[in-house]
UniProtKB/Swiss-Prot annotation:
Provenance organism: Onion yellows phytoplasma (strain OY-M)
Major localization listed first in the record, in broad terms: cytoplasm
Name of the protein in its database record: Cytidylate kinase
Localization: Cytoplasm
Family per similarity comment: Belongs to the cytidylate kinase family. Type 1 subfamily.
Phylogenetic classification of the source organism: Bacteria, Bacillati, Mycoplasmatota, Mollicutes, Acholeplasmatales
């Protein structure tokens, strides 16, 4: 298989390490990386900054027409502005899961994600429905998982880096609620593609997970 046609779908629940691993894997390989969660956060940022109510269908649809998202050098741009840092705000984090449930939002972003898949060589895309919906023809599909305690600890460490002190029990409660939403939503629920390889990252370091994925890429490219 020629390298330029190689596409990897990485899915998993919140805190499974998919974004961190995808980003570092792309840096190691020199490939393109698209974090679809960042796309939802960028769209949420626009709605918050422009005081658009996502519960009001007409206002939301008008706003969606004005939103242009693009990726360049693994950074996300909202209407030509690099918002890679702004989308990590606590306000965006608080609202993104609600915005992500809206069918019109998912439809807009799915169209964009599929366009990116078609136009981008050497692509690593991570999210919750990449292997099942966005890129079902990916050359390699990975589903990352980890136990809830480990995922909560990772989230707590992320929060600490943002200067936010959080309670581990509260994070575990939030993760369980998020899992329930993600697995049971009607539109593109979180699920492992039948041909995806399950990787439990609970006891693995980032480098160990990346080494396993690179071995899987090599194996795929030999077949």
């Amino acid at each position: 298989m020629h390298m330029k046609s190689f596409k990897i779908a990485i899915d998993g629940p919140a805190g499974s390490g998919k974004s961190t691993i995808s980003k570092k894997l792309s840096q190691k390989l020199g490939w393109n990386h698209v974090d679809t969660g960042a796309m939802f956060r960028a769209l949420t940022l626009y709605l918050l900054e422009n005081e658009v109510s996502w519960h009001h269908e007409k206002s939301l649809n008008q706003a969606l027409d004005k939103i242009n998202l693009s990726y360049s050098c693994n950074k996300i741009f909202l209407n030509q502005e690099d918002v890679s840092l702004k989308i990590k705000s606590l306000d965006v984090e608080k609202h993104v899961s609600s915005v992500a449930l809206i069918p019109a939002v998912r439809t807009k972003l799915l169209k964009l994600q599929k366009e990116i898949c078609g136009n981008t060589p050497n692509l690593i895309m991570d999210g919750r429905d990449i292997g099942t919906v966005v890129m079902p023809d990916a050359n390699l599909k990975i589903f990352l998982t980890a136990n809830i305690t480990k995922r909560a600890l990772r989230k707590q460490q992320e929060d600490a880096q943002k200067g936010k002190i959080t309670d581990i029990a509260q994070i575990m409660k939030q993760l369980k609620e998020r899992d329930h939403k993600d697995y049971h939503r009607q539109l593109a629920p979180l699920s492992k593609a039948l041909d995806a390889i399950l990787l439990d990252t609970t006891e693995l370091s980032i480098d160990e997970v990346i080494a396993k994925i690179i071995a899987l890429i090599d194996k795929k490219r030999r077949t």
